[in-house]
């Protein structure tokens, strides 16, 4: 039985971004992360989906759209066949009431659709246009496919990830997309602030996957210029400080430990009953410890390997040494800190009964976000949005018949929470 707190959706909650409408034509992960963040704080996110649905829907587990459910909460779904000029006309009619427009087509495709930035800004001069791509809107690689896997290689991430005697390691998740989505949410707010402060000037945000990921990977270029050396793959070790590693415990679990400052390293040596290591020439300074990392890890690993994960965490926390358990998902979901702060909570779901989802991030004291609505069914909000631009029942039926608009055949209602009484 789940230990997570049971929460319900809060459809009547307001947010800081109430009144900010986002028209999101992007696909897959980066755009969905971006709009999930802003939607959590009240933005009116209209997810424009093709007849087959956003490609994120295809990432299923046991036949269930878990990615879509988590990252498309607080959104509306408008399903349009954008190959039809009538669908493009619908987009144009929605643009004047929109503050942020997002797309992730290959550079030039939006222009071919008749929705160039100039055309959009003519309809709404205050519009913020976010263009997500792999490589950016210009440059030699602009027309290359821009999947995150490729970007994670070119950015330098894979080259520094893994072990020296093994192949470079790509991340086991969509890191480039996720980082771009977070940067994109920041960019959207910066550009929107410009609109508010300087008299309504909209602008274009060029958001490739490559630039944000490279930006967080340490000062690689500066370090290379200074040393002429490429940062090696060091597994869980650091090239900046030692000790720092993942250590195996007696129960097969692992802990992560860092003695990155001198006082912490000395405290660690005393805690494991080896005070003489403080003055050992191999370990006296951080530079010494880096040169003798194998010997240092062997000493620490022997101590940790004789104890379980829980024993190690309790021991080193008592000694005020920086350590933490390396969790798998079941451990995360059972952790008292995670449960108490509701980092994850259970929400009602028609397919799973209860859907564990991450909390709104970040947490604001005066204007916290909220999970107001579950992820929508395909085309769930077609009628509402088309009615807004003057398309009534007859017009809707004609567009539906012509396959300009589409909807899920059976849109399930959100699950009702069962009473505990």
What do the PLM-derived regions correspond to, one by one?
Residues 1-198, 233, 377, 383-421:
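N-terminal helix-loop segment corresponding to the beta1-alpha1 unit
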Residues 52, 135-136, 209-214, 251-253, ...:
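Glycine-rich beta-alpha junction loops
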Residues 68, 234-239, 245-246, 352-355, ...:
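Short Gly/Pro-enriched turn/cap motifs at secondary-structure boundaries
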Residues 169-179, 200-204, 233-238, 242-244, ...:
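A short glycine-threonine-serine/GTX helix/turn-capping micro-motif
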Residues 181-202, 215-227, 269-275:
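Oxidoreductase and adenylate-handling cofactor-binding alpha/beta cores
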Residues 201-210, 315, 397-400:
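Beta-strand segments within the central parallel beta-sheet cores of soluble alpha/beta enzyme folds
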Residues 243-319, 323:
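Aromatic-enriched alpha-helical interface/lid elements that frame and gate functional surfaces
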Residues 318-372:
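A glycine-rich dinucleotide-binding beta-alpha-beta segment and adjacent secondary-structure elements
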């Amino acid at each position: 039985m789940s230990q997570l707190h049971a929460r319900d959706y809060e459809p009547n909650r307001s947010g800081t971004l109430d009144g900010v409408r986002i028209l999101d034509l992007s696909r897959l992960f980066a755009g969905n992360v971006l709009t999930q963040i802003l939607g959590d704080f009240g933005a009116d996110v209209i997810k424009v989906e093709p007849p087959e649905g956003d490609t994120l829907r295809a990432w299923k587990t046991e036949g269930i759209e878990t990615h879509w459910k988590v990252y498309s909460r607080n959104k509306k779904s408008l399903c349009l066949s954008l190959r039809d000029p009538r669908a493009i006309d619908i987009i144009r009619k929605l643009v004047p009431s929109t503050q942020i427009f997002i797309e992730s087509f290959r550079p030039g495709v939006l222009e071919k659709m008749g929705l160039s930035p100039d055309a959009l800004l003519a309809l709404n001069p205050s519009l913020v246009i976010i263009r997500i791509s792999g490589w950016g809107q210009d440059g030699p690689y602009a027309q290359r496919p821009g999947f995150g896997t490729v970007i994670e290689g070119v950015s330098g991430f894979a080259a520094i990830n893994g072990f020296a005697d093994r192949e470079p390691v790509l991340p086991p998740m969509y890191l480039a997309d996720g980082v771009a989505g977070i940067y994109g949410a920041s960019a959207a707010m910066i550009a929107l602030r410009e609109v508010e402060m300087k008299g309504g000037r909209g602008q274009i945000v060029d958001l490739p996957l490559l630039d944000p990921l490279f930006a967080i990977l340490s000062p690689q270029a500066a370090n290379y210029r200074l040393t002429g050396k490429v940062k090696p793959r060091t597994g869980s070790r650091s090239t900046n400080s030692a000790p720092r590693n993942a250590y195996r415990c007696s129960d097969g679990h692992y802990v992560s430990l860092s003695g990155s400052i001198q006082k912490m390293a000395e405290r660690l040596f005393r805690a494991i009953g080896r005070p003489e290591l403080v003055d050992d020439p191999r370990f006296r300074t951080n530079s010494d410890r880096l040169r003798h990392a194998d010997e240092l890890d062997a000493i620490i690993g022997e101590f940790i390997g004789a104890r379980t994960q829980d024993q190690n965490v309790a021991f080193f926390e008592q000694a005020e040494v920086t350590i933490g358990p390396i969790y798998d998902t079941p451990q995360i979901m059972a952790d008292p800190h995670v449960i108490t702060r509701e980092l994850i909570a259970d929400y009602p779901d028609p397919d799973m009964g209860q859907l564990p989802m991450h909390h709104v991030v970040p947490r604001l004291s005066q204007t916290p976000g909220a999970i107001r609505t579950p992820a929508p069914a395909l085309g769930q909000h077609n009628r509402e949005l088309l009615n807004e631009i003057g398309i009534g029942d007859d017009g809707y039926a004609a567009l539906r018949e012509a396959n300009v608009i589409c909807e899920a055949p059976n849109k399930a209602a959100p699950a009702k929470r069962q009473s505990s009484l």
